[in-house]
Amino acid sequence: MLTASICTIGDEILIGQVLDTNSYNIAQELSKIGVKINYKSAIGDTLDEIISELEKCIKKSDVVIVTGGLGPTKDDITKVALKQLSNSNGYKYSEEQAAIIKRILTTRGIAITDINRDQALVPENCQVIEN
C-alpha cells in the first residue's frame, strides 16, 4: 500500500490564525484512493525547520504532500526548501500555475503583481498539484 505524509507549513497555522483544512481534505481524498496516511505535521515558516521536517517525511513515506508557505509574502519559503531538498539547479516558470494564480486573483478582483508572477516559479524537479 502506498503511504503518504502531509506537511502543512505556516506560522499562521501554528498560532491558530488560519484553520488547516488542507491537510484534512488531502487526507480524505488520498484515503479514498487507498493511500495510507502515515504521518501529518504542521510547522512554522523557518527554512531549517521546513527542511528538517520534509527530510523526516521523505524517510517515512512514499509520497510527501506539502501545503502552505507558497504565498506571495517574504515568509513563504517552502519552495526555497524544496529546491534545496531536491538538489534542483533552479526554478521553472509554470504556465499552468500562472493561469491558476491569474484565475484566482482575477475572480477576487485583485491586481496581479510581480510577486504573484513569482508564485508560478517552481523548483525544476517538483510536481505541483492544484488544491
List the predicted regions and their residue ranges.
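Glycine-rich phosphate/diphosphate-binding loop of Rossmann-like nucleotide-binding domains
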Residues: 1-40
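Short glycine-rich anion-binding loops that position phosphate/pyrophosphate groups of nucleotides
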Residues: 11-12, 69-72
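Short beta->alpha junction loops
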Residues: 39-49
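An anion/phosphate-binding loop that grips the pyrophosphate of nucleotide cofactors and donors
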Residues: 61
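Proline/glycine-rich low-complexity loops and linkers
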Residues: 76-131
